[in-house]
């Protein structure tokens, strides 16, 4: 059941949700994570964008597990002003790819990540705009959860903002109050993963005051 701010979803400034069981990756949610899964730190450090996919289907049960991991993402005030569409049929995947120039390969399936405007536009204009802006960030965090879960399960993907939103909305029968934000192709990588180069930590991290790039002293 969706919780709204009036239901006090925060305790001491932290979001409270029902407890979830297991990692929910490629296994039943009532089971413990398989030992073969990589640890969380490795997943975080090795995930990279995957744009070329092997011609292999992804099991429906695994897709459902990935979606559960996606929905465990943080959401402001637990409003969950998001909605997602899964596209799995090969013909539909090809059509969606045709109107998504940012997608280079043909994935096993797509997730279209959207903001649910019916949960952002029912307040004062100023507050509705603020909640809408925040909800877009929540959708992005859900997509990151999806990508990390996919990587942990031996799959890969890439968030794509370059797509014909009007055509995709019409093609998938998406209602007017649902606004697509990202198209996310997911599949098994066709080639070995090559991590992208990142800026050095001392270029982007400041400690205690702006411009102080010295690492925090160890205890």
Swiss-Prot record:
The N-terminus is blocked. Its cofactor is FMN. InterPro entries: Nitroreductase (IPR029479), Nitroreductase-like (IPR000415). Its main location: cytoplasm. The keyword Flavoprotein applies. CDD domains: Nitro_FMN_reductase. Keywords: Cytoplasm, Flavoprotein, FMN, Oxidoreductase. GO terms for cellular component: cytoplasm. Pfam families: Nitroreductase (PF00881). Its EC number is 1.3.3.13. SUPFAM superfamilies: FMN-dependent nitroreductase-like (SSF55469). Coiled coil: none annotated. It is found in: Cytoplasm. It is an enzyme of class 1 (oxidoreductase). It comes from the Bacteria. Transmembrane segments: none annotated. It catalyses: cyclo(L-phenylalanyl-L-leucyl) + 2 O2 = albonoursin + 2 H2O2. GO terms for molecular function: oxidoreductase activity, acting on the CH-CH group of donors, oxygen as acceptor. Optimum temperature is 60 degrees Celsius. The activity increases quite linearly with temperature and is nearly twice as high at 60 degrees Celsius as compared to 30 degrees Celsius. Above 60 degrees Celsius, the enzyme activity dramatically decreases, probably due to thermal inactivation. Optimum pH is 8. Homomer. Involved in the biosynthesis of albonoursin (cyclo[(alpha,beta-dehydro-Phe)-(alpha,beta-dehydro-Leu)]), an antibacterial peptide. Catalyzes the formation of alpha,beta-dehydro-Phe (DPhe) and alpha,beta-dehydro-Leu (DLeu) residues during the biosynthesis of albonoursin. The catalytic reaction of cyclo(L-Phe-L-Leu) occurs in a two-step sequential alpha-beta-dehydrogenation leading first to cyclo(alpha,beta-dehydro-Phe-L-Leu) and finally to albonoursin. Belongs to the nitroreductase family. This is Albonoursin synthase. The gene is albA.
């Amino acid at each position: 059941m969706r919780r709204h701010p009036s239901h006090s979803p925060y305790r001491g400034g932290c979001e409270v949700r029902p407890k979830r069981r297991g990692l929910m990756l490629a296994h039943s949610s009532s089971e413990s994570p398989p030992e073969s899964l990589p640890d969380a730190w490795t997943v975080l450090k090795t995930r990279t964008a995957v744009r070329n996919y092997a011609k292999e289907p992804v099991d429906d049960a695994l897709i459902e597990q990935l979606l559960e991991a996606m929905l465990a993402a943080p959401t402001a005030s637990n409003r969950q002003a998001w909605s997602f569409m899964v596209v799995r049929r090969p013909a539909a995947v090809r059509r969606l790819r045709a109107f998504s120039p940012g997608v280079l390969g043909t994935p096993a399936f797509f997730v279209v990540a959207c903001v649910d405007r019916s949960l952002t536009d029912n307040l004062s204009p100023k507050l509705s705009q603020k909640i809408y802006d925040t909800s877009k960030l929540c959708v992005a965090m859900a997509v990151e959860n999806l990508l990390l879960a996919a990587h942990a399960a031996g799959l890969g993907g890439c968030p794509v903002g370059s797509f014909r939103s009007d055509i995709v909305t019409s093609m998938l029968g998406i209602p007017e109050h649902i606004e697509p934000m990202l198209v996310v192709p997911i599949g098994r990588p066709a080639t070995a993963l090559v991590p992208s180069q990142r800026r050095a930590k001392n270029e982007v991290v400041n400690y205690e005051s702006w411009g102080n790039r010295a690492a925090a002293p160890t205890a």
